[in-house]
């Protein structure tokens, strides 16, 4: 109760099925999540970072929404504050740190040729106007994202670093 669920990015279950050419499986999965979270709490997440698989999945997600009545929500992975920061990421000193953090997040090694990296410079915090332009064919997706934000009651204290608290009982060596 009180949870809102989005289908996720390319790594999400629905998108993975679409990427694998399993439209029926994607539809079945989406309907299962809608049943689990409720029709008013489950959204098909659409993104457009100019990545091939996202562009390929986008029309399928729109079709899936129209066939099932599951609403769309337009989102953007924001790893940088501005477009300029995103463009500079490959030249910045902290680019290596960003790559290391992505490897930690995805459980990959820098030596793994399949480790995650940003294919485009679109991973920045986009304005409402930019999102509306990206999703001009489905304006309801941007509207739904705003409605989701209005339903969330979160206050962030800026200027303070928030780290999770956890214990490592029984661990004596972190290597």
Residue ranges of predicted features:
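Phosphodiester-processing cores and adjacent nucleic acid-binding clamps
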Residues: 1-175
